[in-house]
Amino acid sequence: MTKIQSIRSIRVSLPFETGGPRHGMRPSLDAWTKMECVMVRIKTSDGLEGWGEAFGHAMAPGSEAVINQILAPMLVGRDSVAINHRIAELERPLHGLGRSGPLMYALSAIDTALWDLAAQRAHLPLYKFLGGESGVLTKYASLMRYGGDTDAVAQNVERARSYGFRTIKLHETTIPAFRAARNAVELDLSLIHI
């Protein structure tokens, strides 16, 4: 049995700009100046290290706390190989904490790190271990929500296009905001919405 020896969380903070005032999560803030995520490193008794990432934004401190205070104590000393069983074993006693937010972000990081370890044991890159290439994936820019501010929408769509993106994801909810996005760029640019 290959046991989990340690789990470490590492908060990563990168410079970030929203491109203007935004609306949505923590709307009291005019703009973010950093983007955070939490990396997880799992070390095992066979000398390997697996890595995973927990979604961050404003939730990074919560995800980090879940990893350090809840999940790590439940996992250290346990088998690292039976991944689906291990994740299900974690989810059962924690179901009362919900199926979204920092708990799920933290579980996702643990899950990814365990699969990374399995791929290393198979001497394969993780993407090949999980089934290989699935074809061409189109990159896209995912913009913030600008609360219908058509000028901010147009500016940020144009900025994303200038960086080479041909597909842009909008979080806007009004028709004028979509019109502003469409009018800001050529017709061959694709717009998607969540």
Question: Which role does the model predict for each range below?
Answer:
Residues 7, 43-121:
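Metal- or metallocofactor-binding catalytic centers and their adjacent structured scaffolds
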Residues 1-51, 55:
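Structured beta-strand/loop patches that form or line metal/cofactor-binding pockets in enzymes
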Residues 39, 138-140, 166-169, 188-190:
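Structural preference for beta-strand elements that scaffold enzyme active sites
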Residues 137-152:
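Active-site mouth loops of central-metabolism enzymes
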Residues 107, 170-171:
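Glycine- and other small-residue-rich loops at beta-strand/loop junctions that grip anionic moieties
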Residues 151-166:
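Alpha/beta enzyme core
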Residues 172-185:
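Active-site-adjacent beta->alpha loops and helix N-cap segments on the catalytic face
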Residues 192-194:
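Conserved small/polar residues in nucleotide/adenosyl-binding loops
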